[in-house]
Amino acid sequence: TQEQRSLPANCIVFPPIFRSSGELVFKGLFCFSPLFYFFKKLISEKAYTSLYKFKKYIATAITCRCILADKNFKRLNRQSTESTVYFYWGIGMAYILPFIHNKDKKIVRFHRTDLYADLRPHQYIPFRKEVFESLNKAVFISKQGLEYAKKNFGQYKFSAYCSYLGTKDHGISKIKNEDGVIHILSCSNVVPVKRVSLILKSLLLIPDRPIQWTHIGGGKGFNALQQQLQQLPANLTVHLTGAITNREVIGHYLHHPVDIFVNVSASEGLPVSIMEAISFNIPVIATNVGGTNEIVTSESGVLLDPHFSAQELADQIVRVYEHKDRFHPRRLWEEKFNAGKNYPRFISQILND
């Protein structure tokens, strides 16, 4: 991303360990990082049983060896025991956890695809056992994720709790809907799991209402979605923005009317896109998957069955629009998903526990 964020005075950001896949492979192969460990895990994980698993394992091993050989990593790993190591994802950099020594706290936050192996190809996540054996605190973005971990990884000795993510307070848009049009917004990658085309299918079942649907996000299915817009009824206007920056997303909320936010994904963790929507006091219609029911309640919107029909979504769009004054989404955001409250609380918790 080209967006830059300000840093506190006591924060140091190291340069990337590698800047290209070629540099990664070279550094991962031609270094003095341990080899025997990775050969042993290749056998114990049976990563040789399929081509996908083998390729995934080799790529992961090369990445780990590249990181372990980095001079900045080595320096950090030698620092005092009174240190806290925090990984934002349970995959990727977290794979080096077994090699981090003399640290007081090793903390990993888990989301969705880094937690649920059944969402990964061949249900395979490398070094799963080693990551859970090495951490001493696991943080989950949803209560649903926390319960999943307790059930599936309860044999490992670590403390666990749920700490919601959050979004910044940008206020509430002063743009009012005065044109009688139902303004629908959705925001996701256009990929199969997000089922964006089902939104269009549902909107076509509301012929007697003027509707403007804006979808924010690109992806592999973007061109195919565009093709479906060739012949739209007169009452329906569709705007596909493609991929845009988060600043532009916030700008859309601030400068355009939005009546309903829609998310019909087949699988979710706990969507930040919904957090943003309810922060602007916009009611949500979303599928009851993952931890979505922790943010879409009777106060903030309506939940759909994961296997909803297009007609069901169409009916709910009309109902929520006609009764949107009954919803108070921002109240829920203030209580549970305000970054200004959640992140200081999280930092205090991980430092003081």
Model regions: which residues?
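Donor nucleotide-sugar binding/catalytic pocket of nucleotide-sugar-dependent glycosyltransferases
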Residues: 108-111, 128-172
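Conserved donor-binding/catalytic core segment of Leloir-type glycosyltransferases
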Residues: 139, 163, 167-171, 176-194, ...
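A charged, aromatic-enriched C-terminal amphipathic alpha-helix characteristic of glycosyltransferases
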Residues: 171, 248, 308, 322-352
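Glycosyltransferase donor-sugar binding loop
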Residues: 187, 191, 212-226, 240-244
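Nucleotide-activated donor-binding/catalytic signature segment of Leloir-type glycosyltransferases, i.e.
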Residues: 226-252
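Short hydrophobic beta-strand element within catalytic cores of glycosyltransferases
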Residues: 260, 274, 279, 283-286
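Aromatic "clamp/platform" in nucleotide-sugar-dependent glycosyltransferases that forms part
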Residues: 266
